[in-house]
Amino acid sequence: MRLRSVVGAAPKGMAVVAGRPFLEVLLRQLSRCHFERAILAVGYQREAIQSYFGEAAFGMRLLYSVETSALGTAGALRNAAPLVTSKTVLAMNGDSYTDLDLGKLAAEDRDLPADAGLVLVPADGRSDCGFVAVKPNGEVALFDEKDSSCRASYVNAGIYKFKVEMLYEIPAGREVSLEKEMLPRWLNEGKHIRGFVHAGQCLDIGTPERYQVAQTALAGVEAR
């Protein structure tokens, strides 16, 4: 059962969690970590998001990358690329929350040769997330999206860090999956992809059951 059976036709990011839209939880987290600018990839019922948050919120400037057709997780990044003004970009799924210091992640290893990075959490028996194997030096060795036969210790938490030029390697104007298409391709091409292991909280609201867990878990998250 998917989340829409509980929250109706609203965009997933506007699903109310602990008294506020889930996207507000994520934007407040970015603000607390001293981000000044955020780009929101919007498509389905984007007016609900744009009218709620406007052009600025929580001390951050907000820009909107509008999708007129489904572009997938990688296609959305390619569509947003012209709005990026920094050398590296932090990208997050709009339906998951991880209690790590995003500012520290954005600054970490800024001068190292990794082309991309992703946050990983222990698999802990999960069978519906992207399985990831990591080398001793922290580089990703295998990315096997939602294949439970992969004997990897970690799963993808849905937070990424890219050199901005990587976004322009994604095909433009069509639906492209980051997890199933681009990440495996980049590994096969010899790109350096770093795994950032996080042992803390990782939540998503993709199903009614997880949505209810998030209601309780995020009730105490700072809302100022």
What kind of region is each of these model predictions?
Residues 23, 49, 80, 95, ...:
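Residue-level signal for inorganic ion chemistry
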Residues 35, 86, 113-114, 190-191:
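Short, high-confidence coil segments that cap the C-terminus of an alpha-helix
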Residues 2, 16, 20-93, 102-104, ...:
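Conserved N-terminal catalytic core of the sugar/cofactor nucleotidyltransferase
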Residues 112-122:
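A short, conserved acidic/glycine-rich loop-to-beta-strand motif
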Residues 89-90, 97, 103-110, 123-126, ...:
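Catalytic-core segments of class I nucleotidyltransferases/pyrophosphorylases
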Residues 1-7, 13-14:
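N-proximal low-complexity "stem/linker" segments adjacent to membrane-targeting elements
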Residues 14, 132-134, 183, 195:
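A structural signal for short hydrophobic beta-strand segments in well-ordered beta-sheet cores
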Residues 1, 138-139:
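Residue-level signal for well-ordered, solvent-exposed loop/turn and beta-edge residues enriched
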